[in-house]
Amino acid sequence: MKKTTMLKKNYEFKTVLTKGKCFKEEKIEIFVNKNNKKRNLLGIAIGTKNGKAFQRNRAKRIIRECYTRLENQLIDGNSIVILINKNYDINEITFAEILKEMQIIFENAKLLKKEDEIWKKYLYI
């Protein structure tokens, strides 16, 4: 079951970017803010100066897929905005690099569940 909905409104992005905490790695930045919902809210933002539209869309698809791989391990109730650094060449983006960086950032932000909590869902304990 999908636990995440997308941020769509401009004011939703602004509140996360202004009130949230920032965690950076080489290629991506993640802003995290608590919300009062049982779901995570995800927003992906890439500036128009980062390549052409098809390159930005490809990067968004890669980021979305990386997020869905890590979604079951995340604690619920957060608004998350993911940005790609301006200086990074968007053509060189790879799935493995982004997944690794997202995992590191989520660990630093303490958003990952403990392994016991993850397995309880599958074992019905």
Language model segments and positions:
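Positively charged, solvent-exposed patches that mediate nucleic-acid binding
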Residues: 1-125
